[in-house]
Amino acid sequence: MILANDELKKLISTGRLKVDPLYPDTIRENGLDLRIGGEYAIYAYEGVVIKPCELESARHLFRVVKADEVVIPPRNFALLTTEEYVKMPDDVVGFANLRSTLARYGLVIPPTIVDAGFEGNITIEVVNETPNTIVLRRGMRFLHLVLAKTEGRAQYSGLYQGQRGVTPPKGLKNEC
């Protein structure tokens, strides 16, 4: 069941769902609009062969940029972080979607789940499918998070728990 704004307000007022900072326009009809944080990550190299199964960490492949503007080159992508630190209830899952206005400029994100029990800034991959450079601004609403109740409760203990700022991918060396 997708949670409407009245249910979201209840979860926030009881402290079960935390969104910090919480702006007047964060809570929408059927989800939360989240803002671009103060840093993003892009690949530091071009033409490199990346083998995730051989990496313990991929952080060295990325350059973290602290800026008020996010520059996404043509047919490239950037890892963006939310300004908001989010703490999800253990019985609510989030489905991240790019705001449709930004999608109309040619930006897309892959299907992204914010797990029940997750806590941290949310890192999202934003792909520029166009032949043009697209520049976004820190603080603009970019992500719409739809929340839904789960049957039962979850204990999230993933590597990204508690992440602050933009977080490049982990390596998959121990999973392949």
Swiss-Prot record:
Its EC number is 3.5.4.13. It catalyses: dCTP + H2O + H(+) = dUTP + NH4(+). It comes from the Archaea. One of its GO terms (biological process) is dUMP biosynthetic process. Pfam families: DCD. The keyword Hydrolase applies. The keyword ATP-binding does not apply. The active site is at residue 125. DCTP binds at residues 99-104, 115, 163. It is an enzyme of class 3 (hydrolase). Pathway: Pyrimidine metabolism; dUMP biosynthesis; dUMP from dCTP (dUTP route): step 1/2. GO terms for molecular function: dCTP deaminase activity; nucleotide binding. Keywords: Hydrolase, Nucleotide metabolism, Nucleotide-binding. Belongs to the dCTP deaminase family. Catalyzes the deamination of dCTP to dUTP. NCBIfam families: dCTP_deam. Homotrimer. This is dCTP deaminase. It comes from Pyrobaculum aerophilum (strain ATCC 51768 / DSM 7523 / JCM 9630 / CIP 104966 / NBRC 100827 / IM2).
